[in-house]
Amino acid sequence: MRSVIADSRRLVVKVGSSLVTNDGRGLDHAAIGRWAGQIAALRAQGKEVVLVSSGAIAEGMQRLGWTRRPREIDELQAAAAVGQMGLAQVYESRFAEHSIQTAQILLTHADLADRERYLNARSTLLTLLRLGVVPIINENDTVVTDEIKFGDNDTLGALVANLIEGDALVILTDQQGLFTADPRKDPAATLVQQADAGAPELEAMAGGAGSSLGRGGMLTKILAAKRAAHSGANTVIASGREVDVLSRLASGEAIGTQLIARTARMAARKQWMADHLQVRGHVVIDDGAVEKLTEGGKSLLPIGIVGVQGAFARGEVIACLSAAGREVARGLTNYSSAETKLIQRRPSGEIESVLGYMLEPELIHRDNLVLV
């Protein structure tokens, strides 16, 4: 089996906290130097690389003299702010040894949820790659609370892969890859060398939590691979402890777990909608509407809606749930939540008589709807 990285031109590489820190006692300058060297080698092969790096909070803890990761959000944000200084400095100096310029980019999920900011971020990243710069990306933990508590850089790596239409996402961790079961508990567990991204059985295999320094367990990596597949990006989950792992993957050596994107690449606009991590609201739809959306490729009409959850405005991304609560699709709504409550279960011909106007006959047009 040949590594998919060998034939990939544009890569997103995510490096976890444990691979760039001294067990939480600040940044490991030597390790970061090795990553810079391997990425420089990939660049020499004509590959474009965007690096998503953890480590800011761990570095901030070291600089502030903290031995335990704080639980308070404001202290986590303070550590991130202090640590980002050191993280940027080390990467800049190590890549400079290879005559490579770096750029620091701090993103939040909100940046990628807003269409205009999303396109601006994409334009900036593509320009940096064209100029031969290696972008170093991290979540902007200093100003965001939800991401510190629940977010992870695996997901961010997948979002960036979709943003720049990367060929592959490489998630480097302190584990060998995905196993059929937890190898710490099951001696019969074997490494999954290759599977389809998004295969349902993968989520059942992926268990366990991340280390005390990082936030992402194996499940987040599996879900990240599923998300990256939206843009056709394959994913490799491999151990960053393997010597020259990036160089070996680029040479075609199969290391870790390969998750292949089998689904057709989404159109850019639909991909952006699918990548929304936090939708504004939900509509519950009946079984007939579920069938029309999933099998018929139809638009969502008001008559198929049986419930409205949350508050949303026209033009915002909302999720469509089945009666069982499973997300079926998401898309841009033509009506606000207040308007939707008035027209639900009604045929489109009655919209004007209920509201006094009709913007569109559909709640979500099929061109603005994506299955998930």
UniProtKB/Swiss-Prot annotation:
Gene3D superfamilies per UniProt: Acetylglutamate kinase-like (3.40.1160.10), PUA domain (2.30.130.10)
Cross-referenced SUPFAM superfamilies: Carbamate kinase-like, PUA domain-like
Residue ranges of every copy of the PUA domain listed in the record: 280-358
Main location per the UniProt record: cytoplasm
Free-text function comment from the UniProt entry: Catalyzes the transfer of a phosphate group to glutamate to form L-glutamate 5-phosphate.
Entry's family note: Belongs to the glutamate 5-kinase family.
Residues the record lists as binding substrate: 54, 141, 153
Catalytic activity: L-glutamate + ATP = L-glutamyl 5-phosphate + ADP
Organism listed in the record: Paraburkholderia xenovorans (strain LB400)
Keywords: Amino-acid biosynthesis, ATP-binding, Cytoplasm, Kinase, Nucleotide-binding, Proline biosynthesis, Transferase
SMART domains, alphabetized: PUA (SM00359)
Pfam families: AA_kinase (PF00696), PUA (PF01472)
Location(s), subcellular: Cytoplasm
Entry GO terms, CC: cytosol
Gene: proB
Chain sites annotated for binding ATP: 14, 173-174
GO molecular function, one term: ATP binding
GO biological process assignments: L-proline biosynthetic process
Coiled coil: none
EC number assigned by the record: 2.7.2.11
Entry protein name: Glutamate 5-kinase
Protein's pathway: Amino-acid biosynthesis; L-proline biosynthesis; L-glutamate 5-semialdehyde from L-glutamate: step 1/2
